[in-house]
């Protein structure tokens, strides 16, 4: 335990296994003056950690138990971890030869004791596939204002069709909005068909065991396929009852 509390050398194997060693070393440089940017770096004897190659620091982060999660900076740098994760997702998506999925959720809770607790929740998801195909989803629930909102966007490179629906369970107000990016409203149906054709190539097949079980339960007859998700129009709008917006 005492060994971990002192500043060890980067070559020490214990340094590589201690997730807080890099943080302590950084603090030591800051307290020694100059915040790690000494004007005399060029004439040091080479023992100063800041003058060593970056590969040594990268190696230490890689061996650290939390290094791969972006937590090697000490105290579990959550913002750094999120930035690294988003950067890795964008890098993989830009490669054009993989499918990616990312999701983030923010929840705020407060209870002052003079009423019902206030909860705010926001979730964002993104799925991507080769060819610049993306699906974005965003949901918001705010107990204070009574707002519930959901938006789904389909993207093909720089074109997008975004459908957003919201309601207020306190006032009963409902709203629907459609946004088009580099599209005309008359091109929306053709764009949706193109998006479904492109995404159908990447749908996962169900396991063989599941198909066998389904066939045995259904007397040898299988369903034509899993049900498609859909957002249907409001029931109080007769003009939209026959409309089906498949996602």
Swiss-Prot record:
Keywords: Cytoplasm, Nucleus, Phosphoprotein
Bias kind Acidic residues: ranges: 182-192
UniProt modified residues of type Phosphoserine: 216, 237, 239
Compositionally biased region (Basic and acidic residues): 134-144, 170-179, 193-225
Subcellular location, record wording: Cytoplasm; Nucleus
Pfam families the record matches: Mlf1IP (PF10248)
Biased composition (Basic residues): 154-169
Region (Disordered), start-end ranges: 122-247
A GO-annotated cellular component: cytoplasm
Entry similarity comment: Belongs to the MLF family.
Protein name per Swiss-Prot or TrEMBL: Myeloid leukemia factor 2
Organism: Mus musculus
